A protein has these predicted regions:
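Structural motif corresponding to the intra-repeat A-B loop/turn of tetratricopeptide repeats
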Residues: 18, 22, 52-56, 90, ...
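Acidic, serine/threonine-rich low-complexity intrinsically disordered linkers/hinges in large eukaryotic
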Residues: 303, 310-338, 553
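Generic helix N-cap/helix-start motif at coil->alpha-helix transitions
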Residues: 4-13, 22-27, 37-46, 56-63, ...
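Residue-level signature for tetratricopeptide repeat
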Residues: 18, 50-51, 103, 160, ...
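Catalytic glycan-binding domains that act on GlcNAc-containing polysaccharides
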Residues: 175-179, 207-214, 220, 224, ...
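Alpha-helical repeat scaffolds
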Residues: 1, 25-35, 57-71, 94-102, ...
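Alpha-helical segment of the N-proximal tetratricopeptide repeat
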Residues: 99-103, 153-164, 193-196, 324-348, ...
Length: 575
């Protein structure tokens, strides 16, 4: 009855999971071909398990299993069962299973860690439980490893200890355990210790990483933090080496493409081959669409400009979007207040309903439909999926322009910065509310709003007024201005403070004076790190739209370092 709809595929996804849990492989195999979303790691693991049981798994199946299993942070049934079978059949190694346990321990996921240990060493579960509860006590309870199993448990204990006491983990590894672990285990633990030190912006992080004798033994996440620590220390050779050790998929990320190019160009004597390779890397990502894409553009001597507008949509293209039943159902659900359900159906209709998703012109037409209905988040996200053309009217809309621009200019804020922040905070969804209570266009916390209202003399304020767009913009811009002034006009630091609170970036700025991009890449919180990059890239694009002139992201990033003694701290009581 609902064939081809989001609802049908969502139900099929859940049904496949249930069939897998029941071990009803015949029904699972019958329903799997109609599953369009294909984004459930556990469903894919069940499919790989069936292939292995029936002798159809090819040479690539083990690699795919590892990828899905390692991507799951929480304990699951499908990938655990598949890993158990692949291990029993000799298709994956004991090391592959122990690595899953290490990743789970580092992520503080004890059940997922226990599931992995049970596959490879079920007799070790009681000892593993003791290790997880108190790694320091466990490591002090005996003097030698006495075999491979104990080596792996010591490795897990050191990884877990590093998350809470990095210096103690380093001391114990160096003084007691390093000689009793295999080179691979020792490298992994030093990688975990280095990562935890880098997360704390500790200057000794790079010294810990220097103990690694083979960087390819580390996970991509560890290598990413090795790159960040090396950037912070200005060690460009180490940047290059760590990126080269990453997996092929990781090296394709624009972050590491950019920093590899910078590392190639950073030496005292850059060869012609290095210069050519660096320029090829930069050209492969350069463009206006994102943080590192914009920085690559500037490294090539260009600035960020609004790209040419695509050809106008034809009446037929617009009509086809309006006639799309899934898009209309989505818009209707959003209008009824069922935003989550509506967003999921919209994404399914644009990405998955037809193989390969909608074409470029269809995406522009769907985005146009969302723009017309003022469903700005779907307008932006859909338009961002086009590659050969970019419609900046859709990607960087400016709702409430008279309000936002007037309010920003009245208090000395760059309207492009305000728009860049709103685009990231709420996607212009007026009734947006976060899980922690932030509300409205500028996602203001009630306590922050009350403090700001008192600060600017707004009397009679109550938190329910955050639903009013004028009040929300007034308080949001006022708070942003106070934050910006507190951080001496640094858009980068102010964006970090807006997301993570002012106390954290005050601490994060201490240390060496860094170029803004390096400081941003070293923000310890992944959410805030992603946030500041997007806000500043958004700001640069909005400035290009508002002024019609080429813009520089680098100029907005500036440099970040400790506050000088001559700079007085303003608004020290910022919430």
């Amino acid at each position: 009855r609902y064939a081809g709809t989001y609802q049908e595929d969502r139900l099929r996804n859940d049904w496949l999971l249930l069939l897998g849990q029941r071990r009803d492989w015949a029904q699972f195999a019958a329903f799997l071909p109609g599953y369009r979303m294909g984004d459930d790691h556990e469903v894919r693991c069940y499919a790989l398990l069936i292939d292995e049981v029936e002798g159809r798994a090819d040479a690539r199946a083990a690699d795919e299993l590892r990828r899905h299993w390692y991507a799951l942070r929480e304990a699951d049934d499908g990938c655990t069962q598949a890993a158990s079978r692949f291990y029993a059949d000799g298709k994956i190694r004991a090391l592959d299973v122990w690595r899953k346990a290490r990743l789970a321990v580092e992520a503080n996921k004890p059940r997922a860690a226990r599931n992995a240990v049970e596959i490879v060493a079920p007799e070790a579960l009681p000892e593993a439980r003791s290790m997880f509860e108190s790694p320091s006590k466990y490591l002090l309870s005996f003097a030698t490893t006495r075999g491979r199993l104990r080596q792996e448990l010591v490795t897990l204990a050191l990884v877990r200890l590093a998350a809470s006491d990095v210096d103690n983990a380093a001391r114990l590894l160096d003084a007691k355990w390093a000689g009793q672990l295999s080179p691979e285990e020792r490298n992994w633990v030093w990688g975990a210790i280095g990562k935890q030190a880098a997360l704390r912006l500790a200057p000794e992080a790079l010294d810990y990483f220097a103990n690694v004798t083979r960087e390819r033994d580390l996970s991509d996440d560890m290598l990413a933090w090795q790159v960040r620590a090396a950037l912070r220390a200005g060690q460009w050779k180490a940047v290059r080496q760590a990126i080269d050790a990453m997996s092929e998929d990781a090296r394709r990320d624009s972050t590491w493409v950019y920093w590899k190019a910078r590392a190639l160009l950073a030496g005292r004597h850059v060869s012609d081959a290095e210069r050519t390779q660096a320029h090829q890397l930069l050209e492969s990502i350069a463009g206006p669409q994102g943080f590192y894409e914009q920085l690559a553009l500037e490294e090539l001597g260009q600035r960020v400009s609004v790209p040419p507008a695509p050809a106008p949509l034809t009446p037929e293209e617009k009509a086809a979007a309006r006639a799309n039943a899934a898009l209309q159902r989505s818009l209707y659900a959003i209008a009824l207040g069922l935003r989550g359900e509506g967003v999921r159906e919209w994404n399914y209709a644009t990405n998955l309903h037809t193989p390969g998703g909608m074409g470029e012109r269809e995406l522009l037409a769907a985005a146009d439909l969302a723009c017309e209905r003022h469903v700005w988040d779907r307008c932006i996200n859909t338009s961002e999926r086009t590659r050969s053309v970019m419609d900046y009217r859709q990607r960087f809309p400016m709702p409430l322009q008279s309000l936002v621009v007037a309010r920003s200019q009245a208090i000395g804020l760059d309207p492009a910065y305000v728009y860049g922040l709103i685009r990231q905070e709420s996607r212009f969804v007026l009734d947006a509310r976060s899980g922690v209570g932030a509300a409205g266009l500028m996602q203001i916390m009630p306590a922050t709003a009350r403090w700001t209202a008192r600060k600017i003399g707004l009397t009679g304020f109550t938190p329910d007024q955050l639903a009013d767009r004028d009040t929300n913009v007034t308080l949001g811009t006022a708070y942003l201005k106070l934050v910006l002034d507190s951080f001496d006009g640094s858009m980068l630091l102010a964006a970090a403070a807006y997301n993570a609170g002012p106390g954290r970036p005050r601490n994060w700025r201490n240390g060496p004076v860094l170029e803004g991009a390096i400081w941003a890449e070293n923000v310890p919180f992944s959410e805030t790190r992603d946030y500041v990059k997007k806000v500043l890239a958004n700001t640069t694009n909005y400035a290009a739209v508002l002024t019609g002139q080429p813009q520089s992201l680098k100029a907005r990033l500036g440099q970040v370092g400790p506050r000088s003694d001559a700079q007085a701290q303003t608004n020290a009581d910022l919430p």
